[in-house]
Amino acid sequence: MKHLWFFLLLVAAPRWVLSQVQLQESGPGLVKPSETLSLTCTVSGYSISSGYYWGWIRQPPGKGLEWIGSIYHSGSTYYNPSLKSRVTISVDTSKNQFSLKLSSVTAADTAVYYCAR
């Protein structure tokens, strides 16, 4: 029984640790057409440099979630093909933050933006 208990703790620990992770978006609430939207996500409770992909998603009014892109702590990026030409995601491990820049915004970019892991 001791072995089973240890195994359960070992499996459960990573989930417990990750449950303490908090992400907080910051940036302007409004951006004018043709301007660049800049958002920053500050991570607490976990070091970005320890791994995992970090990303941005958005939800236009009355629609579902749309993946914008993701970044690994090393700087490797992956973007939604439909937004790739306008999106830049970067990471600053020294500040434990990652950022989104979306250029040439239009009314079609109206959405609630979220950072995620």
Curated annotation (Swiss-Prot):
GO cellular component terms, A-Z: extracellular region; immunoglobulin complex; plasma membrane
Subcellular location: Secreted; Cell membrane
Annotated organism of origin: Homo sapiens
Disulfide cross-links: 41-115
Location of region: Framework-1: 20-44
Keyword Electron transport appears in the UniProt entry: no
Region (Complementarity-determining-3), start-end ranges: 116-117
Alphabetical list of InterPro entries matching this protein: Ig-like_dom, Ig-like_dom_sf, Ig-like_fold, Ig_V-set, IgHV
Name of the protein this chain belongs to: Immunoglobulin heavy variable 4-38-2
Region (Framework-2): 54-70
Keyword terms, alphabetized: Adaptive immunity, Cell membrane, Disulfide bond, Immunity, Immunoglobulin, Immunoglobulin domain, Membrane, Secreted, Signal
Entry annotated with the keyword Secreted: yes
Domain spans labelled Ig-like: 20-117
Ranges for region Complementarity-determining-1: 45-53
Gene: IGHV4-38-2
Any Pfam family: V-set
Region (Framework-3): 78-115
GO molecular function terms attached to this record: antigen binding
